């Protein structure tokens, strides 16, 4: 019979004990959440919607979207990614780090929402910091922004709500 342990367990049982990063064991969970009313003109191809600032050293646990039907047809697609900001201008670091060309905004989604955290992201990156999710070689410090980029336009105004859960040391 095999007994296999995660790194968290192996670190705890090691002699001397090895500390695991707080973002993966006993970290502080935080939440960013909100709602934005989107006009039909906010859903054009190449438009962006910034959801929330997240500390660059945080580890994203979950990104859930809840929305009205934002597309009366079947054209709306969007990415969920990471952006930096300078003087009010947002620059994509990885515009589809979490989700790529999702179609979830084409129909209303309530209830438990749609978790898009691993739609494009590999599950083995759980516990990785936001700056690493963005493909950066070092932590820029401060905040990075989680945002949506519309690849193909929607045409229906409505509300978009989000809940982003993340862990900090």
Regions found by a protein language model. Name each.
Residues 2-169:
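Surface-exposed, low-hydrophobicity beta-strand/loop segments enriched in small/polar/acidic residues
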């Amino acid at each position: 019979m095999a007994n296999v342990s995660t790194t968290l367990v192996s670190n705890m049982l090691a002699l001397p004990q090895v500390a695991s990063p707080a973002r993966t064991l006993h970290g502080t969970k935080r939440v960013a959440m909100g709602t934005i009313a989107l006009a039909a003109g906010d859903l054009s191809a190449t438009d962006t919607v910034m959801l929330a600032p997240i500390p660059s050293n945080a580890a994203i646990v979950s990104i859930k979207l809840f929305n009205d039907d934002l597309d009366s047809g079947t054209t709306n697609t969007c990415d969920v990614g990471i952006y930096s900001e300078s003087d009010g201008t947002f620059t994509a670091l990885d515009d589809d780090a979490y989700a790529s060309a999702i179609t979830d905004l084409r129909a209303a989604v309530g209830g438990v929402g749609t978790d898009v955290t691993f739609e494009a992201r590999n599950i083995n990156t759980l516990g990785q910091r936001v700056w690493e999710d963005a493909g950066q070689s070092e932590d820029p410090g401060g905040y990075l922004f989680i945002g949506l980029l519309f690849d193909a336009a929607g045409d229906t105004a409505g509300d978009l709500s989000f809940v982003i859960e993340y862990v900090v040391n």
